[in-house]
């Protein structure tokens, strides 16, 4: 079970981290999501 569940969740977290990185490069988006972007202003 663990081996089968690892791949989809890894793909999902990769997509999420890519989306978050894109968001954090935009001041308006990173300002609205400080917890995603390290909480830095």
Curated annotation (Swiss-Prot):
Keywords: Acetylcholine receptor inhibiting toxin, Amidation, Calcium channel impairing toxin, Disulfide bond, Ion channel impairing toxin, Neurotoxin, Postsynaptic neurotoxin, Secreted, Toxin, Voltage-gated calcium channel impairing toxin. GO terms for molecular function: acetylcholine receptor inhibitor activity; calcium channel regulator activity; toxin activity. Residues 25-27 are annotated as: Ser-Xaa-Pro motif, crucial for potent interaction with nAChR. Disulfide bonds join 23-29, 23-37, 24-29, 24-37. The keyword Phosphoprotein does not apply. Changing residue 34 to A: Loss of inhibitory potency on alpha-3-beta-2/CHRNA3-CHRNB2 nAChR (Lt1.3-II). Its main location: secreted. The cysteine framework is I (CC-C-C). Alpha4/7 pattern. Lt1.3-II (C1-C3; C2-C4): Alpha-conotoxins act on postsynaptic membranes, they bind to the nicotinic acetylcholine receptors (nAChR) and thus inhibit them. This toxin potently and selectively inhibits alpha-3-beta-2/CHRNA3-CHRNB2 (IC(50)=44.8 nM) nAChRs. This is Alpha-conotoxin Lt1.3 b. It comes from Conus litteratus. The lineage of its organism: Eukaryota, Metazoa, Spiralia, Lophotrochozoa, Mollusca.
């Amino acid at each position: 079970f663990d081996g089968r569940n690892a791949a989809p969740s890894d793909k999902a977290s990769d997509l999420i981290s890519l989306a978050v990185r894109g968001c954090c490069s935009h001041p308006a988006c990173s300002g609205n999501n400080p917890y995603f972007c390290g909480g830095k202003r």
